[in-house]
């Protein structure tokens, strides 16, 4: 497996052909969403950060059902703006606190190379 670095400019190239098993071996959280925010993939590292089983979140709306603490201009607003412009590519710090101890993270959002989907990468700080 290739090493994938959090925050790298070409991270979406590395993920384009990754299997679910490879995705689960990443050292940071990786969540793939469609344009509406529906969860398509949710890796094991993200489960470790949030305590949520990937099987329980696949198909749910990330902003409404999985992480309502992200339903803010700072998080969901950036996602929607990037989706609307077709060029989602942003990085910022955030605090996840929905049904968990407040956890400061770095978030990296990128448009996927394949399909009409988007990645949210999460690393604890």
Curated annotation (Swiss-Prot):
Residues 23-86 form the PAS domain. Pfam families: PAS. The 4-hydroxycinnamic acid (p-coumaric acid) chromophore is covalently bound via a thioester linkage. GO terms for molecular function: photoreceptor activity. It comes from the Bacteria. The modification S-(4-hydroxycinnamyl)cysteine is found at residue 69. The keyword Cell cycle does not apply. Belongs to the photoactive yellow protein family. This is Photoactive yellow protein. It comes from Halochromatium salexigens.
């Amino acid at each position: 497996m290739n090493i994938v670095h959090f925050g790298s400019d070409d991270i979406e190239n590395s993920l384009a052909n990754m299997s679910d098993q490879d995705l689960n071996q990443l050292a940071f959280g990786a969540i793939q969403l469609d344009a509406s925010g529906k969860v398509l993939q949710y890796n094991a590292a993200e489960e470790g950060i949030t305590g949520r089983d990937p099987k329980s979140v696949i198909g749910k709306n990330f902003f409404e059902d999985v992480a309502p603490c992200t339903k803010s201009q700072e998080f969901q607003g950036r996602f929607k703006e990037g989706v609307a412009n077709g060029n989602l590519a942003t990085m910022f710090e955030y605090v996840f606190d929905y049904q968990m101890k407040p956890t400061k993270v770095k978030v990296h959002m990128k448009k996927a190379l394949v399909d009409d989907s988007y990645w949210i990468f999460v690393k604890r700080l």
